[in-house]
Structure formats: C-alpha cells, structure tokens
C-alpha cells in the first residue's frame, strides 16, 4: 500500500509538470507533521515567483490517493488540479495581498478562524492568535472570494508592529467582521437532510422564532456559510443568547471546524459527550477539519469559556 501511495505521489508530480509546465524542482512533497503539512501529507506546488514571495498551492495527497483508489480517473484528478491552479492564478492573489501593509484597507477584511493549537503549533509560531485550551482563534485576512470559496492568509506578528496596533484592538475588529461576514445560525438535522434549500435559523435578532432543544440531543450551531462555522460560538453576543434561550450554562462539542453542538449542561455529562465526540471524529471528521476532542463549557454568570475534559490518551 505504501509503495502504491509513493508511486501515486510521484505520478502526480510528473502529471502536474506535464500539464502545466511548472518545473519539477518547484514541486515538492512534505510529510504530515512538517510546517506546511500539519494535518496531512501535501504536495507543494510553487506556481509564481515575485521579488519578495512565492505563490504556493498545497495539495492533500492522501485525499487525492483515496479518490484515486475509489475509482476517480487519474486524468480527472490532474484536470481538477490544473483547473484550481488556473483559478488561483486568475485571482491575482499576490497583488491583492499587498494591501496588507495598509491597516485601514486591511481592517474590513480581517476575520477569525479556529485551528487546533497543537497540530498547527509550527505554523502559529509567528501568527496572531489567542488560545482557549487547545483551540487557537487565529487572525486572518480575506484575500478573495469566488463561488463561496474564500482565499485567505494569516496575519503575522510583524504586521501588528508595522500597523502600530495592539493585538486586542485588531482582534475586536476581526471578531465583529466575522459576525457580519457569516452570521450565526442554528441548523436542524432533519431539515438539512430533507430540504436542500434549508439555510438554518436566525436566533440573534429581535423577532427571531428559534426554539433550542433543551434535552440531551443538543443543537447544531454554525454560520450562514457553514465553512469554518464553529467560530460562531465565540462571536459577539452569541454565547449569551444561547444561554438565555437554553436558560442554562451549556457544553460545546466541536465535531469539526465547521460546526459545534450546543448541549444544555443540565441533562448530559461532559464525559459522555467526549465519548460521542471521539466516535464522531474517528468515523466522520476529515483529518483537515479536526478541531479538538475536548469538551468546553460556557458559564452564563461569569461569561467565561472553560475546558472541562482532559486530553485523550492518544493526544498526550
């Protein structure tokens, strides 16, 4: 199996070179655990060089190999890769990131994403972020958005110094931007399964009629865009409103970076939730979408988030 995988990766390198003309020396493989491959093997394709930077596209080779094993033709995989590279080139991302030096132009584009602080520790060394347990709230700038797909870049510590801004001030702007870029929504599983047009339920505005489940089943929280929607629980006023609607403190179960289950803490134990989360991660959460296997709680009296379960044995 390993030899088949290695042969596939080598074939990918050759296929990309032949389809795009990108020199082989600009295509490199990095094993999981490297700085640019924290959650999975990646093929790094340098497709454009500038005076002060390279533009690089990272391909998750294990996912591509799985698709190949499941019957996807190799030619189709190469076509999808070249289409993505062409789309990225046309987006002119490098030029659009140059505004990053101007804080006033960058400010409306700032937003927050969640990452696992341990798995991404190498890449977070000079990033701007805050932590809660093993969750990192990371500062990003939106570069482009095409057909619902957002291209973004992390803000590095050096930019705060160049802007002359404190971390707390910039974070406050980014959290607020994140709310308006993709407002929070409650999603009903039965609606998601049977109604393709379902867009979730608003619960933050006066007049919203959204009743939360107060039993052990819990409520699925995400955002209108769903992608990276687990951040919703940390957006302004959201935790307070959830606690008000539940009339209770609540536990948070982050099934992926895209959503978080909200559970009334009167009817379920965190240890039981952690067992369910462990199974969900193993059976349904792609490696690159993993956030945490720990359970968190919101206290409505203190307005604080805390971690209430220890690390799993395989994380220590």
Protein language model regions, located:
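C-terminal structured domains
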Residues: 224-316
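Residue-level signal for secondary-structure boundary elements
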Residues: 20, 24, 93, 182-186, ...
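Charged, alpha-helical interface segments at or near domain boundaries
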Residues: 29-220
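Generic alpha-helical structural element
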Residues: 1, 5, 159-163, 231, ...
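Assembly/interface hotspot detector across virion components, adhesins/toxins, and nucleic-acid enzymes
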Residues: 27, 212, 296-298
